[in-house]
Amino acid sequence: MGTTAQLVPTELLPEALAALAKQMEQDDLDPSLTQSIVKDLLTDPGKEGYKAAGPLKARAVQIRTESMAPPTATVVNGNVRTVIALVGTSGAGKTTAAAKLAAHFVAQDKRVALISTDTDRVGGLEQIRAYGSILNLSVDLAYTADEMREAMQNRRDADLIIVDTAGISPIDEVQKEILKELLREAAPNEIHLVLSAPTGLRQMRDAIQGFKDVGVDRLLFTRLDETNRYGAACSVAIESSISVSYLTNSRMVPGDIYATEPATLSKALFVRTLNGTAGS
């Protein structure tokens, strides 16, 4: 499905499809994606069966899901150490996401270690240490490449190491170089860009573009409980072709982290809630 489409006047659309297009627009889905989905539905061989809202939404979910990269949740098998890094802007929810991930794998009897590189945020160190205490995990601090190397060595027996990085601006090249240096020492298998779901489409796009050269290969959306508009998240997931790994609700640890199934985010757009659309 392309990201550009000629506008179809709403008044020319069947009633149910016009209502669906309006909902997608109100939910901040990129307008060109909305129009592309509308045109796909208009030309779909089964369009006569989509006159009711239910079947129409179901087909729209399917179309949008087919446009996204397959989801890729983290797999920890215990035979080879897995290292994941969470990157993103300040306030995206990286530390809480790191703790939720840690709790998720602790519950699977995995040996989990946390490493924090956040030296700047007020209360950041106390927050991750508090999460570590809740989960009975020690937290290593690594503010330099040498400290990261030492922390990785100290936690060499872990099944999973989660590196919670400091929030930085996607256009701050100096801070990005520092981040890259730390990541070179950590050598993560996965780099998740953490995006807060209430964030606007333009800001999400800027973050994805800005962190691209860091090696991001997954998107992790947080705070889905703080909005009922998931169009921006759906839009960037489609446009970027980057897999979505996890969705999170709330700041509760443990809990409220969902490994994305193929249609999770698409369904959430229409039902306006994450609950019931994915399994943790």
Which functions belong to the PLM regions below?
Residues 1-111, 115-120, 130-144:
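Primarily NTPase-proximal linker/entry elements flanking Walker-type ATP/GTP-binding cores
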Residues 110-113, 153-162, 174-199:
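Inter-motif core of Ras-like GTPase G domains
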Residues 113, 188-195, 212-227, 231-254:
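Conserved beta-strand/loop subsegment of P-loop NTPase cores
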Residues 119-122, 146-147, 167-170, 197-201, ...:
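Conserved nucleotide-binding/hydrolysis micro-motifs of P-loop NTPases
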Residues 125-126, 170-176, 203-204, 230-232:
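Conserved ATPase-coupling elements of RecA-like P-loop NTPase cores
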Residues 30, 95, 128, 164, ...:
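Residue-level signature of catalytic and energy-coupling elements of molecular machines
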Residues 1, 235-280:
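NTP-binding/hydrolysis catalytic cores, primarily Walker-type P-loop NTPases
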Residues 132-167:
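Conserved nucleotide-sensing/catalytic segment adjacent to the nucleotide-binding pocket
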